Amino acid sequence: MVIDEHRLSSLDLRGCPNLKCVEVTNGGNLTSIQLDTCKKLETFNCCANFSIGSLDLLLMPNLKSLKCDYNKIESLDLSASQNLETLSCVSNSLTRLDLSNCKKLITINCKKCPLTSLDCSQLNLLTNIDFSECNQMEDFPKLPKGIKSITCERFPPIANADLSLFPDLTNLKAPYCELKAFDASKCRNLVSLNLWGNHIAALDLSGLNHLDYKSVDTPQKITLGAERIPNKSSLWRLYLPENVDLGKIYSYDYTDDVARRYYSLYTEYFTGDDGIQRPSFVANHLDLDNNLFVYNYKTNLFYEEEGKQKEILMDVYVAAKQVPSGVEDLAAEKTVKGVVYYDLQGHESAVPFSGFNIEVTQFTDGTSQSKKIIK
């Protein structure tokens, strides 16, 4: 039975004991579904009804697949769901989920639920789980050793997870998790890896011999502290994390067309007050409002394409944040040194061109700010 895009406020199917599949989806008024006598039911889909606050599953012992995404369910009693293999409860109001009797579960998707914890350690058949955006969960879930696929978008606690506990892990999706590092040595069997939008400055993927290069997503966004170099007031030093090897930076350039044409950028090791050499970028242009430049980092993982060996590169987009020096007042109003305009061909003028312009405001502290305008 399939009912989609309906206006039902309630549904009573107690007179249909032989039903094996029920799909009631996309209805904003439905508040109750009665399936008390549907003991043969194997598949139940009640996604996107939005008003359902509870489900009674106690008299459905043969249920194998339950999908109840996008409702208002606050609790889910699965004590009688011993045969459940697939559970999807995305975007509900669940704060806890007792899965202790669901020993046959293979796939769980509890994305966007306010769960405070999740224990799946006794679910030995579980291979796939998605707990993305479970923002109330402070600790990484307890998962079985045989888990193969983990999706945890916007889930910072993964930073403290020991992935070596899951030797069968082949797919990991952890975008936007605020990660500053990733230890690939703990998950050697990965085939697919998504670390998009984290804050990783250097990445070593050596040893991931099963990784499919077409299934690797690693663009990063980092913010570096910037400070004017003493006795070189026009130059800024941007401090890279110590684990960055400048020799592994394949290429780099400003993201702005005008900056690429008129400003310089280079890498340099410098010696700190403690005598230790550290990596940095040096620039004579600083834009504190946008991505300043991007660099491509070698990951030590190679693949063959069209008979040539290539290396997977990680794109890292860099923004700058001025570091207080104790001398300058960062809150003080900046003094404008001058304003210049550029057209699409890169021609410079003290006054705006007719049509599209890039306006570059230069300040006396060596920074600049650009914006697009139309005259």
Q: Residues of each region from the PLM?
A:
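Concave beta-strand-loop units of leucine-rich repeat
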Residues: M1-L8, N18, E23-L30, K40, ...
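C-terminal edge beta-strand
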Residues: G307-V323, K372-I373
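A structural signal for leucine-rich repeat
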Residues: L13-C16, Q34-C38, L55-M60, L78-Q82, ...
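Residue-level detector of functionally pivotal "anchor" positions at catalytic/ligand-binding pockets or at interdomain
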Residues: K321-H347
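C-terminal tail/sorting-segment detector
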Residues: I358-K375
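Leucine-rich repeat domain C-terminal region
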Residues: V191-K248
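Surface-exposed, short loops/turns at beta-strand junctions within beta-sandwich domains
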Residues: A283-V294, V351-F353
